[in-house]
Regions:
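Residue-level detector of short, conserved catalytic/binding motifs and their immediate flanks
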Residues: 88-90, 159, 226
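Short, solvent-exposed coil/turn segments at beta-strand boundaries
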Residues: 83-90, 111-114, 132-140, 203-209, ...
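Short N-terminal edge-element motif at the start of the domain
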Residues: 90-133
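Start-of-domain marker
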Residues: 23-89
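Exposed beta-strand-loop-beta-strand "reactive/processing" segments of non-cytosolic proteins
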Residues: 75-97, 139-147
Length: 242
């Protein structure tokens, strides 16, 4: 069985077909179907990095990709798509882990205003939600994500980005007592919160408050939160709340 799998993978790797060249000659729907069929019968975790390569090529080589929802890839090959509230940014997340208890994901951002369908790799975990506020006239994108260390440990994160010269750059909008940050993280440990009671990062519906779970020295949730209140220049730490 291993020999057959290796032979199949060899054929498909040579056939990284060339997806970029291939996709130029057919519709985006046909190219998506070709990728879906290429990997449908294979072990996902044995080929997911090749899937990532083909998906990235397909998106980059198709001007229509921004408006396309990729139904087959999201349903069958675990592609996750998010969009910014202003619909000017589209985010793709691909599962590139090995299938064990640890999780690994690759995320990319695509700009609607870009003259090409280029993708920007992002250092995020599995993207959960995207919110948007303004700092003056500048849109600030708040991306919540989760890093899965293993089945029992992980990291919740909120990151702030802004557009600069056709690229997303970190935006240091979180003002602590001592410094400004572009991201805030909080650890998760199932030994202390097996049922994941409550949100580790709470964002108010009006986006005026962001609360971060306060952990004790043993990474145990205290039931309290560190509050960041929105101001004219970002989010200012204001103290501890319940």
């Amino acid at each position: 069985m291993k020999i057959i799998s290796k032979c199949l993978l060899g054929v498909f790797c040579c056939a990284h077909f060339n997806m970029a060249l291939y996709a130029k000659n057919i519709s985006i729907q046909q190219a998506e179907q070709a990728i879906d069929q290429k990997y449908a019968a294979l072990d996902f975790y044995a080929v997911n990095q090749q899937i990532e390569n083909d998906v990235v090529d397909l998106i980059r080589e198709n001007a229509e990709s921004y408006a396309y929802s990729f139904p087959k890839l999201t349903e069958n090959l675990r592609l996750k798509i998010n969009a910014s509230p202003d619909q000017l940014l589209k985010f793709y997340t691909v599962d590139v882990g090995g299938g064990g208890t640890m999780g690994e994901f690759s995320s990319y951002a695509q700009m609607k205003s870009s003259k090409s369908a280029k993708l920007q790799p992002l250092e995020t975990g599995y993207i959960l939600k995207i919110d948007q506020v303004k700092e003056g006239a500048q849109p600030i994108y708040l991306i919540q994500s989760y890093y899965k260390g293993d089945s029992c440990h992980g990291l919740y994160q909120i990151q702030a980005f802004k557009m600069h010269v056709q690229a997303l750059t970190a935006a240091p909008v979180f003002q602590t007592k001592k410094k400004q940050l572009s991201s805030i993280e909080v650890e998760y440990d199932c030994h202390y919160d097996e049922e994941r009671r409550g949100s580790y990062i709470r964002v108010a519906k009006d986006l005026n408050k962001i609360d971060i779970t306060l952990l004790d020295q043993n990474s145990r949730p205290t039931g309290k939160y560190l509050r960041y209140q929105r101001s004219n220049t970002g989010y200012q730490y204001t103290g501890v709340t319940k």
